[in-house]
């Protein structure tokens, strides 16, 4: 009973190795039809390990080459960004990185100051905006008060003009009446003077006639 179980386990192991080998061969682009014995299998494993190690070394070398090329490119760009002074060619990678660190710190400080100034300017802008709105409301109120006062002033001016016109008319009527009354009084005075004069003339002529009648001698003379 134990022998068949061992045989089955061995067959399963060989089948598993066969499938694993086929998968590896499929990955590398070649296939084998028959299973190998243990020696051949060990030789293939060593060869595959050596191939893997060589391929991994070449891959690592290629990656390292690309990494160094990228690092050189980044260092050249960093030299253009960081102020190094007149002796920029003599700087090592370490000194370049240290200067870059200091430059970054300086830029961060400048950025903080700029942010603080921006916030302060924004606060001042909000304050000035509120002041401007307040002045606008105050100006509107003053304009309305000024327009009301000007309308009241114009109404009072019109009333004063009406009063002046009425007083002028009254004075004109007074002057006309006084002039007419004075002319009438002058006319009456002249008429009375004329009547008096006529009365005096009449009386003098009567007296003369009476005297002549009483003294006929004077008539003869």
From Swiss-Prot:
<dbReference type="GO" id="GO:0000978">
    <property type="term" value="F:RNA polymerase II cis-regulatory region sequence-specific DNA binding"/>
</dbReference>
<dbReference type="GO" id="GO:0005634">
    <property type="term" value="C:nucleus"/>
</dbReference>
<feature type="region of interest" description="Disordered">
    <location>
        <begin position="29"/>
        <end position="67"/>
    </location>
</feature>
<dbReference type="Pfam" id="PF00010">
    <property type="entry name" value="HLH"/>
</dbReference>
<keyword id="KW-0804">Transcription</keyword>
<dbReference type="GO" id="GO:0046983">
    <property type="term" value="F:protein dimerization activity"/>
</dbReference>
<comment type="function">
    <text>Component of a transcriptional repressor complex together with MAX. In complex with MAX binds to the core DNA sequence 5'-CAC[GA]TG-3'. Antagonizes MYC transcriptional activity by competing with MYC for MAX binding. Binds to the TERT promoter and represses telomerase expression, possibly by interfering with MYC binding.</text>
</comment>
<dbReference type="GO" id="GO:0006357">
    <property type="term" value="P:regulation of transcription by RNA polymerase II"/>
</dbReference>
<dbReference type="InterPro" id="IPR036638">
    <property type="entry name" value="HLH_DNA-bd_sf"/>
</dbReference>
<protein>
    <recommendedName>
        <fullName>Max dimerization protein 1</fullName>
    </recommendedName>
</protein>
<feature type="domain" description="bHLH">
    <location>
        <begin position="55"/>
        <end position="107"/>
    </location>
</feature>
<dbReference type="InterPro" id="IPR011598">
    <property type="entry name" value="bHLH_dom"/>
</dbReference>
<comment type="subunit">
    <text>Heterodimer with MAX; the interaction is required for DNA-binding. DNA binding requires dimerization with another bHLH protein; does not form homodimers, and does not bind to DNA in the absence of MAX in vitro.</text>
</comment>
<keyword id="KW-0805">Transcription regulation</keyword>
<dbReference type="GO" id="GO:0000122">
    <property type="term" value="P:negative regulation of transcription by RNA polymerase II"/>
</dbReference>
<dbReference type="GO" id="GO:0000981">
    <property type="term" value="F:DNA-binding transcription factor activity, RNA polymerase II-specific"/>
</dbReference>
<keyword id="KW-0539">Nucleus</keyword>
<keyword id="KW-0238">DNA-binding</keyword>
<feature type="region of interest" description="Disordered">
    <location>
        <begin position="178"/>
        <end position="221"/>
    </location>
</feature>
<dbReference type="InterPro" id="IPR040157">
    <property type="entry name" value="MXD1_bHLHzip"/>
</dbReference>
<keyword id="KW-0678">Repressor</keyword>
<feature type="short sequence motif" description="Nuclear localization signal">
    <location>
        <begin position="21"/>
        <end position="49"/>
    </location>
</feature>
<feature type="compositionally biased region" description="Polar residues">
    <location>
        <begin position="193"/>
        <end position="221"/>
    </location>
</feature>
